[in-house]
Amino acid sequence: MIQSTQPLATTRAQLLERLAQTETFDLAIVGGGATGLGVAVDAAARGFKVVLLESLDFAKGTSSRATKLVHGGVRYLAQGNISLVREALHERTTLLHNAPHLAQPLAFVMPSYKLLDTPFYGIGLKMYDALAGKAGLGATEFLSSAKTVKYLPTVQQKGLKGGVKYWDGQFDDARLALALARTAAAKGALLINYCPAEKLIYENHQIAGLICRDAESGRNFTVRAKCVVNATGPWVDLFRQQDAEAQGKPVKPMVAPSQGVHVVVDREFLPTDHALLIPKTADGRVLFAVPWLGKVILGTTDTPRHDLAREPLPFPEELDFILGEAGKYLSRQPTLADVRSMWVGLRPLVKPQDDDGENTKKISREHTVMSSKTGLVTVTGGKWTTYRAMSEDVLAECFRIGRLPSRPAGVTVNLPLVGAPADGAVTHRMNQSQGLHSYGTDAAAVAALPGAQNWLVDGLCEAMVRFAARFEYARTVEDMLARRSRLLFLDARKAAEIAPRVAAILTEELGQDVHLNDFLALTRQYLPAQG
């Protein structure tokens, strides 16, 4: 049963006034992605006075561009990283439990074209089950070729010997980020997007806060805080460099960025509730075909990238690789003309000492938390699945260096996120189109707003736009169509078509420029060049 709740307003003028009026925060977090938002939830839940500042929109960077999987990491098991797999499996269970409206179990099928592939991969996945223990989502199955085709109707049948089925999870990354932001706010944290942290403040050679700027008005704010956390993902080295300059010494970069390209095609390419896993591509990596929100995601790549663009573009060879590899395992070869949207995420992989950063498959997927002599706490690496454990490690470091008084961990293990049904019931599947069901317990509040019956496109009504403006921090058309609705990531052409109508509603709600033309230009980057 879904109960009605009263959402917390996110009126920007009130948020900024609160920022101006607060004398000192316990914790100032820079970065509104999965990691920063997770720290905000944990710290606020422990009773600390928290502010989080994001230069653009929450989850604008890496955290909205994942492969949408909540997973223990099958490939990490193959690398022998048992501790990472065990932690991730535990966190997978916690996430699925705390946000069942946004994260759910998903069955994967791995087709086998060699006789020994089924037992080889199956035994490894049985180990995966064993590591999961009671946290397992379902037992690994060895499949006949007929059963494999039943689960994957469009799989390439020529030479098919059988398959293996196992369980992991999937989620809506951007909406989970919003749920974290709203959960932190409900616990008393102050979160502001479009408010970049510009400069660190020092007293007696120790960090005492920062200066931030409201990107909409240009107004500067001095934010004093007992502890400052740098959770800016692939961009953490920019703040570390500023901190190092204050100390008068150079800093060695700790991030080796890698980009992952994802391509979205129509459901007809994989008309099933099961995901397809390609265990070994031409370059030895894993490739997924994942049903998600009425479409299918194909991905991903793992390409070193030395620039840090906010909107990175795929290399042509990456698109060729994904479509080509998918075509080897699907009965119909997807082409560029079939691409409905595409996106690139930058992974903040932790760079080992003396590594040139070129082999991103072997660079650490684990997270790193460190602090400087001035007291700047930096966290990077990791993945969405383990965001909660990362948050606990960040606060442990804040305690260790004496910036905050220690308080017991574990407060977020059984903390339902905003929108989660009290009984933990799953009311819809993640592979169906978006709709009011995506809001969980907020569905009634959305339906009560004007325009609940005015559908702009399948899965998006006028009331959802109003709800985003009033209760979900949305400031622009992009915020709405990329991260409150996921339409830009599902069908960039449709997103462009309805953008003017969305802009009109947002303008009515916010009374300001909502950057329609910027969004229309952006939609073109989410489609491959034709010809």
Where are these regions (language model features)?
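Extreme N-terminal leader/targeting segments of oxidoreductases
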Residues: M1-L27, D42-R46
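C-terminal accessory subdomains/tails of enzymes that are appended
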Residues: L15-R18, T24, A28, L56, ...
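Short hydrophobic core segments
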Residues: I29-V30, V223-G233
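A conserved short coil-to-beta-strand element within the FAD-binding core of flavoproteins
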Residues: N193-A208
